[in-house]
Amino acid sequence: MDWVAVIVSIIPFVGVLLAVGFYTLLERKILAIIMIRKGPSKVSYMGILQPFSDAGKLLCKEFIVPTRANVGPFILAPALMLAISLLGWLLYPYKSAEVFYVFGVILFMVITSVSVYGVMMSGWASNSKYSLLGAVRAMAQSISYEIPMGFIFFCVVLCSGVFMFQEISVFQQSLFFFFLPLCVVMLVWMLCMLAETNRAPFDFVEGESELVSGYNVEYSGGGFAVMFIAEYSSILLSSVMSAAMFFGGNEALVGFFMMVFAIFFVVVRASLPRLRYDKLMNLCWTVLLCVMLTASVCVVVLVGV
């Protein structure tokens, strides 16, 4: 076995885990600034090691399985969520990657579609009313936003002519950012990504004021830590894919706009309240779907001309 190849293939995942830790610190700092308070500042210099302290604390705590829970699925759900979120990073469009998926766009759609299964499994296996309601919301929400998201990919693929995220990014280097002709599509994409990652104002799956903590209310210790890492890994993945699809070009541009989108998620969380659940359903089925159908027709006509 070529151990060098194994180590090289593991490095990106280690980088993702480190990025998640520092992203949580960045989020807490930005939220503190917006709320006019200090934020984490005690652990190491300016609190820079706070995420690792929190992770160590969670992993050292006992992982409690509720008496009425279904033990197998309850333990498997966090691992499934983390595996699915890390699998998406294989599609990350960097030039030094050894594997490029020819149908990366389709694979990304599959990954985002099956990501809800981990939430569904945890909610059902917990045997808690709050967890089950969170899982049911996640399933209905997933069906609602994935249809407009499919039309978004259709528009981007039609403009670039390829299904690889790497090629979509490179295509924009020679012409222009897809953000310019597809600004409406990008707006719908950002709404879909907020719903996909269960972030405010679409954080119905957790809904602290309604469901205590939603699907993960019964999790503690390492199980909760793994779920937390999976959630924030998905946020960073959504940021980098957004940058590659609409602000592609060289790696520096993709990295810069990835940070912009990542900060956007935090600012939206601090700025907007949670909507009513029926408002999201109405938005997806009556507004976003109609907008994307119209946009798809316009893109087909313009590309054909």
From Swiss-Prot:
<feature type="transmembrane region" description="Helical">
    <location>
        <begin position="3"/>
        <end position="23"/>
    </location>
</feature>
<feature type="transmembrane region" description="Helical">
    <location>
        <begin position="175"/>
        <end position="195"/>
    </location>
</feature>
<feature type="transmembrane region" description="Helical">
    <location>
        <begin position="71"/>
        <end position="91"/>
    </location>
</feature>
<feature type="transmembrane region" description="Helical">
    <location>
        <begin position="246"/>
        <end position="266"/>
    </location>
</feature>
<keyword id="KW-0496">Mitochondrion</keyword>
<keyword id="KW-0472">Membrane</keyword>
<keyword id="KW-0812">Transmembrane</keyword>
<dbReference type="Pfam" id="PF00146">
    <property type="entry name" value="NADHdh"/>
</dbReference>
<feature type="transmembrane region" description="Helical">
    <location>
        <begin position="221"/>
        <end position="241"/>
    </location>
</feature>
<keyword id="KW-1278">Translocase</keyword>
<dbReference type="GO" id="GO:0005743">
    <property type="term" value="C:mitochondrial inner membrane"/>
</dbReference>
<keyword id="KW-0813">Transport</keyword>
<keyword id="KW-0679">Respiratory chain</keyword>
<keyword id="KW-1133">Transmembrane helix</keyword>
<keyword id="KW-0249">Electron transport</keyword>
<feature type="transmembrane region" description="Helical">
    <location>
        <begin position="285"/>
        <end position="305"/>
    </location>
</feature>
<keyword id="KW-0830">Ubiquinone</keyword>
<comment type="similarity">
    <text>Belongs to the complex I subunit 1 family.</text>
</comment>
<keyword id="KW-0999">Mitochondrion inner membrane</keyword>
<dbReference type="GO" id="GO:0008137">
    <property type="term" value="F:NADH dehydrogenase (ubiquinone) activity"/>
</dbReference>
<keyword id="KW-0520">NAD</keyword>
<feature type="transmembrane region" description="Helical">
    <location>
        <begin position="145"/>
        <end position="165"/>
    </location>
</feature>
<dbReference type="GO" id="GO:0009060">
    <property type="term" value="P:aerobic respiration"/>
</dbReference>
<feature type="transmembrane region" description="Helical">
    <location>
        <begin position="99"/>
        <end position="119"/>
    </location>
</feature>
<comment type="function">
    <text>Core subunit of the mitochondrial membrane respiratory chain NADH dehydrogenase (Complex I) that is believed to belong to the minimal assembly required for catalysis. Complex I functions in the transfer of electrons from NADH to the respiratory chain. The immediate electron acceptor for the enzyme is believed to be ubiquinone.</text>
</comment>
<dbReference type="InterPro" id="IPR018086">
    <property type="entry name" value="NADH_UbQ_OxRdtase_su1_CS"/>
</dbReference>
<protein>
    <recommendedName>
        <fullName>NADH-ubiquinone oxidoreductase chain 1</fullName>
        <ecNumber>7.1.1.2</ecNumber>
    </recommendedName>
</protein>
<dbReference type="InterPro" id="IPR001694">
    <property type="entry name" value="NADH_UbQ_OxRdtase_su1/FPO"/>
</dbReference>
